[in-house]
């Protein structure tokens, strides 16, 4: 299992290739969503070790990214285009 490290991010190379084939989103594009100042991050309820981010990439696509803390780095687990309801959360904010 080859781990790719890019700055404060890391991911499994085979997982990244499979994710891009399935969802059409590379993990390099996914890490751009972390740079979005309007991105929304939440801890997953089912898995306390994972976090979800809805943010925009430089390509202008709103992405849904699942990540986990891995020591001092953020490990990208999966990434896909946001669903319409997730996009609304991004555009209008989570309901209080």
Label the predicted regions.
Residues 1-96:
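Ribonuclease/tRNase effector modules and their secretory precursors
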């Amino acid at each position: 299992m080859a781990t790719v490290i890019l700055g404060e991010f890391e991911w499994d190379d085979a997982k990244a290739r499979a994710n891009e084939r399935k969802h059409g989103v590379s993990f390099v594009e996914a890490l751009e969503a972390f740079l979005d100042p309007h991105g929304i991050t939440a801890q997953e309820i089912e898995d306390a070790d994972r976090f979800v981010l809805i943010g925009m990439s430089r390509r202008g696509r709103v992405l849904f990214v699942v990540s986990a803390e891995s020591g001092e780095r953020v490990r990208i687990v999966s990434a896909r285009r946001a669903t319409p309801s997730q996009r609304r959360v991004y555009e209008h904010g989570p309901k209080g």
